[in-house]
From Swiss-Prot:
The gene is esxV. It comes from Mycobacterium tuberculosis (strain CDC 1551 / Oshkosh). It is found in: Secreted. This is ESAT-6-like protein EsxV. Forms a tight 1:1 complex with EsxW. GO terms for cellular component: extracellular region.
Length: 94
């Protein structure tokens, strides 16, 4: 009986997670642009409230980016570890 694992799929999934994390920067900038367009809500673009919101938004995006990127790295590492273990076990049976 042959078992065929697709470790490349696991690596690709991890890479996709990391790529999506990278795309967050574009979304972040688009939201900042919208916030600045509606800055009158906070008392103007230079107001402490507007700048505070932008700062907090940046922190939130940074946390999300770091977590998504780290998760993608872990998925890729797990796939690599499984592939190496499978290869080692397979060669020991040969």
């Amino acid at each position: 009986m042959t078992i065929n694992y697709q470790f490349g799929d696991v690596d690709a999934h991890g890479a996709m997670i990391r790529a999506l994390a990278g795309l967050l920067e574009a979304e972040h900038q688009a939201i900042i642009s919208d916030v600045l367009t509606a800055s009158d809500f906070w008392g103007g673009a230079g107001s402490a409230a507007c700048q505070g919101f932008i700062t907090q938004l940046g922190r939130n995006f940074q946390v999300i980016y770091e977590q998504a990127n780290a998760h993608g790295q872990k998925v890729q590492a797990a796939g690599n570890n499984m592939a190496q273990t499978d290869s080692a076990v397979g060669s020991s049976w040969a």
